[in-house]
């Protein structure tokens, strides 16, 4: 179906199982007339929507849909070169979908720009998602499982957290329970909470992203995840840089390498839990922290472990400049092995490497005295100045 240039005021359209709907980008305008929903598709075989401007006019959407464009079940979905504006809920709400969303501009959604749940081979690439109320791009599952969505080359900007909370909302890219997701080459700026937040996402890759001016932790891998590769990202401006945490919930197994983290703040969107905001990189279990550069982290450059939740962490070959404490490592009873070696630490105001009992520093500078009798620590060949 080809829509010539013009304005089309419509409501409550049920899309057929096979449809190619196309128009002239910016000139073929579908305007939501209200009183229910705009586009709803269920159990589609092949659905393509290309070259359309879709305007929700911030009108009310019924409880039977989650977004201005709602697709529940699609063997092959293509949304390409569209503009989707002013949704009263999510802009795109996708459930059990395979296919691709690409080269589209999405803005002004009351909730998230793109919400995907239970995907099976979805690619979200080359889009601009901006000025949304509660999230940018969401990749979720109802239960933990393989998802394999690719989120690449998108611009995500100015994402708010109108629903409040301490992390579920206000994230540029949010992965929840979805395994095997790749998040690469995105530019994410001015999000109320995280640029990229993965909660329970196994085998996630977060690579080559630019994360600017995040309100809370810029890159988060948290809760019951197993497997995270976080590399070659730039974080400039955040309350915390990169957090790979929640060993107490089963979070473990990660590589954090070749990231640049700078210009952190001790002010966040809510009163901080101990030890506070202003940490460059945090890791807890079965993790290698290697070859990163951290500058201007007012609390800690690196934070290794929390209480007894420390196991098999290496911190080697990192450069840390202008931190409160260069590296803070747990020395609580029950903490597991950590190797801290071959790091350069410059301008750490409260010591280059300090052992901590939770938030309290309890050792001298280990860069000068070695492991201070803590058998679980190896501290060697670090250069502090």
What are these regions (language model features)?
Residues 16-18, 25, 43-44, 49, ...:
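Parallel beta-helix/beta-solenoid
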Residues 1-4, 9:
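Acidic Gly/Asp/Thr-rich repetitive segments characteristic of extracellular carbohydrate-active
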Residues 10-12, 25-26, 31-38, 58-64, ...:
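Short glycine/acidic-rich loop motifs that flank beta-strands on beta-rich extracellular proteins
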Residues 8-22, 30-76, 91-97, 142, ...:
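Extracellular beta-strand-rich solenoid/capping regions of secreted or surface-exposed proteins
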Residues 1, 22-23:
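Extracellular beta-strand repeat scaffolds in secreted/surface proteins
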């Amino acid at each position: 179906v080809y829509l010539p240039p013009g304005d089309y005021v419509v409501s409550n359209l049920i899309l057929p199982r096979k449809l190619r709907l196309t128009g002239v980008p910016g000139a073929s305008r579908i305007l939501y007339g209200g009183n229910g929903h705009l586009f709803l598709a269920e159990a589609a075989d092949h659905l393509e929507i290309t070259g359309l401007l879709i305007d929700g006019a911030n009108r009310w959407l019924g409880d039977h849909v989650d977004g201005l464009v709602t697709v529940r079940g699609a063997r092959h979905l293509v949304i390409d070169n569209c503009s989707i504006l002013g949704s009263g809920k999510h802009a795109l709400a996708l459930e059990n979908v395979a296919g691709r969303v690409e080269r589209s501009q999405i803005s002004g959604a009351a909730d998230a720009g793109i919400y995907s749940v239970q995907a099976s081979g979805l690619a979200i690439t080359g889009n601009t998602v901006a000025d949304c109320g509660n999230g940018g791009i969401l990749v979720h599952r109802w239960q933990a499982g393989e998802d394999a969505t690719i989120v690449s080359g998108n611009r995500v900007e100015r994402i708010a957290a109108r629903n409040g909370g301490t992390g579920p909302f206000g994230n540029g890219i949010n992965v929840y329970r979805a395994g095997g997701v790749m998040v690469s080459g995105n530019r994410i700026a001015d999000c109320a909470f995280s640029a990229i937040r993965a909660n329970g996402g196994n085998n996630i890759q977060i690579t080559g992203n630019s994360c600017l001016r995040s309100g809370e932790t810029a890159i988060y891998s948290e809760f019951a995840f197993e497997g995270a590769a976080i590399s070659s990202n730039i974080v400039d401006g955040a309350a915390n840089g990169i957090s790979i945490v929640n060993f107490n919930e089963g979070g473990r197994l990660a590589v954090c390498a070749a990231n640049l983290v700078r210009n952190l703040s001790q002010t966040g969107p809510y009163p901080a839990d101990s030890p506070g905001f202003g940490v460059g990189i945090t890791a807890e279990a079965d993790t290698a922290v290697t070859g990163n550069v951290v500058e201007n982290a007012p609390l800690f450059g690196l934070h290794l472990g929390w209480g007894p939740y420390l196991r098999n962490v290496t911190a080697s070959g990192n450069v840390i400049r202008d931190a409160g404490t260069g590296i803070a490592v747990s020395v609580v009873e029950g903490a597991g092995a950590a190797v801290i070696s071959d790091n350069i630490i410059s301008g750490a105001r409260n010591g280059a490497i300090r052992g901590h009992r939770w938030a309290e520093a309890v050792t001298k500078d280990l860069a000068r005295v070695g492991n201070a009798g803590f058998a679980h620590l190896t501290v060697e060949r670090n250069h502090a100045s």
